[in-house]
């Protein structure tokens, strides 16, 4: 049996998890299994626009998009690269968030990607009003 190759990301310690016991920091979320590196076209805001246009409804342009639970961040970073909108998102797994942040920085996309829980993310006071949430 071959030895598996290490995954292409590193874990960045997250200060927000300090003080919580090891048994409860993840709040039941599975964090010991890496998510896939896939692109999910269902999250593409242009698909929503197409559906509205097919019904002869106007779809306004959007300036700010959000992806909740972005996994490795492939989709959110592709969307950030594909248009002028500002993208923000969160994934509870610190390793996933770190990899997604590295993608954004490497491509100079400016996406703001966090490793917050949904509760922490919703409580942030530095988020814009989102035009699109996927």
Region spans (language model):
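Conserved alpha-helix/loop element of class I SAM-dependent methyltransferases that forms part
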Residues: 32-63
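Conserved SAM-binding motif I beta-strand of class I
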Residues: 86-91
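Conserved SAM-binding strand-loop segment of SAM-dependent methyltransferases
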Residues: 108-120
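A short acidic, Gly/Pro-enriched loop at the edge of an enzyme's catalytic core
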Residues: 124-132
């Amino acid at each position: 049996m071959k030895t598996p190759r290490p995954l292409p990301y590193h874990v960045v310690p997250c200060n927000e998890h300090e003080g919580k016991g090891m048994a409860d920091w993840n709040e039941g979320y599975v964090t010991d299994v890496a998510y896939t590196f896939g692109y999910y076209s269902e999250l593409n805001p242009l698909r929503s626009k197409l559906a509205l246009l097919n019904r002869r409804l106007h779809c306004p342009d959007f300036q700010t998009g959000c992806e909740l639970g972005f996994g490795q961040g492939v989709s959110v970073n592709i969307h950030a690269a594909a248009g002028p909108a500002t993208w923000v998102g969160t994934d509870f797994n610190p390793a996933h968030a770190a990899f997604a942040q590295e993608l954004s920085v490497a491509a100079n996309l400016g996406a703001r990607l966090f490793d917050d829980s949904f509760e922490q993310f919703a409580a942030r006071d530095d988020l814009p009003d989102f035009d699109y949430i996927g």
